[in-house]
Each structure stands twice: as structure tokens, then as C-alpha cells.
């Protein structure tokens, strides 16, 4: 069973805590993307990154000095977004690190697929960015089915905790043999159930922590998740979609 999760824009370098364990699987493809980005002007990169001058400057300098092989941080400790804050890997026990290393895969526009302990350096790139390398019109074409082939294992089970931008990389290549379960976090807004972005990100991270703490190997056990006020809604769920509703006091 594999769990897929989106990356975060905000990243840090931490070479003092835990050493990474190996390099990402597709480091040669990453090198190709790095070269393509370095061939662009600062103004072109600002458009690709869709960010302000300050963030452009920061990431332009990162790109100029980027070393994909040295002073690396384990991926799960490098990302600082909301999901990763609620996963809280910095306080994982050894068994929880082992669980996520075996089961969690972080999808990345720059690295493709990351195991939690893969060594990474901060970058800025989203899967939807206008990047045309070789004959590829975009990054979805560039990565093709590589992410799917990397993630799928002998169990054929994938738990989707990623955003649509990243889960698309997997969904396009699913086969009838695969069991693909999307986890949906929502709450009542008037008469409708809606997904609130921030709460969903919090819940995705908390869900990974819950699965790691409970060493979950069977998708049915995910239904017991009851953190951050969420409860499983069996009446709204199916074999391919587990719906959790946040009960607002």
C-alpha cells in the first residue's frame, strides 16, 4: 500500500537533525529540469514561478547555487507546508519513520517521486508550471507514467491524500487491477458539504501521522480516523472515496 501526498512550496535546509538516506529515484530527470530552468532569465522564471519579485530573487539565487548532491535534507523534513506541520515528522519515533519510508510517497514537479528520507534541496516548481522540455508540452507530459510506475506496488493499493494538481499524475495511468482510494475532508456549509483548503491540508498531514502511529496496512482501518473533529461518513463514501466530515462545535 502506498500513500501519495503533495509537496509544499515552503522549504528549508536542515543538515543538523537527521541525515538523508539516498537520492531521489529520478535525479537524472531532475538535473534536466534544473538545466532548463537555469537557461531562463529572471523575468521568465518569475512568470514560470508565478510569484513576486522578492520570492523570485530568493529562488533565482537558490537555482544559481543549487547542488543536487550535497548539503541535502530528508524530503519529509524539508517541506514546511501545513500538511507537513500537522504530520510533525520531526517528533516521529523510529517506527513511524520506518512506516512513512515504506508507505508514503511525496509527488514533486521537480523530483518526480520522493521517499520521505530522500535527500533534497529547496526548489520552487509546481506541476502546472509552463515548462516545455524537449518534446513535452508540460510537466505532466514530461513525467508521463513514471510517477505512477514508481508508486504502484504489489498490493496495487494507493491512498490519495494529494491535491488534484498532483494526483492527476497518477490517475491517468490507473488500471482496473488498481485499488485507488481518494480521501475527502469536508464540512457543512449551509446545506452543502464543502472542502476548506486549510483544514483539508491539516487533515492530510494528521492522517499520515495517524496511519504511521497505528501502523495501518489495511485501508478499512483508515475509517477509524477521528482527529481534528473529523468523522468517517459511510453514507457518503464508496470503495474509491472515503469521506470525512469535520463536526463544527
Predicted stretch roles:
Residues 4-91:
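Active-site helix-to-loop segments that bind/position phosphate- or nucleotide-bearing substrates
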Residues 2-6, 157-160:
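Short hydrophobic beta-strand segments
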Residues 89-239, 243-249:
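Internal, well-folded beta-alpha domain core
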Amino acid at each position: 500500500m502506498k500513500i501519495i501526498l503533495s509537496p509544499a512550496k515552503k522549504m528549508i535546509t536542515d543538515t543538523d537533525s537527521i541525515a538523508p538516506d539516498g537520492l531521489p529515484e529520478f535525479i537524472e530527470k531532475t538535473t534536466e529540469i534544473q538545466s532548463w530552468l537555469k537557461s531562463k532569465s529572471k523575468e521568465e522564471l518569475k512568470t514560470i514561478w508565478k510569484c513576486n519579485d522578492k520570492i523570485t530573487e530568493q529562488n533565482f539565487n537558490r537555482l544559481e547555487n543549487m547542488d543536487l548532491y550535497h548539503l541535502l535534507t530528508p524530503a519529509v523534513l524539508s517541506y514546511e507546508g501545513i500538511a507537513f506541520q500537522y504530520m510533525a515528522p520531526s517528533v516521529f519515533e523510529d517506527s513511524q519513520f520506518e512506516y512513512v519510508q515504506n508507505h508514503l510517497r511525496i509527488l514533486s514537479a521537480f523530483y518526480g517521486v520522493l521517499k520521505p528520507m530522500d535527500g533534497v534541496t529547496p526548489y520552487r516548481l509546481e506541476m502546472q508550471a509552463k515548462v516545455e522540455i524537449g518534446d513535452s508540452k508540460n510537466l505532466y507530459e514530461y513525467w508521463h507514467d513514471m510517477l505512477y510506475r514508481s508508486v504502484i506496488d504489489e498490493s496495487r493499493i494507493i491512498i490519495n491524500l494529494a491535491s488534484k494538481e498532483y494526483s492527476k499524475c497518477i490517475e491517468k495511468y490507473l488500471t482496473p487491477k488498481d485499488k485507488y482510494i481518494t480521501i475527502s475532508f469536508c464540512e457543512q456549509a449551509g446545506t452543502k458539504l464543502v472542502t476548506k483548503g486549510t483544514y483539508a491540508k491539516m487533515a492530510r498531514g494528521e492522517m499520515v501521522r495517524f496511519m504511521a502511529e497505528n501502523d495501518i496496512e489495511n485501508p478499512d482501518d483508515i475509517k477509524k480516523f477521528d482527529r481534528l473533529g473529523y468523522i468517517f461518513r459511510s453514507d457518503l463514501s464508496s470503495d474509491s472515496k472515503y469521506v470525512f466530515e469535520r463536526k463544527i462545535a
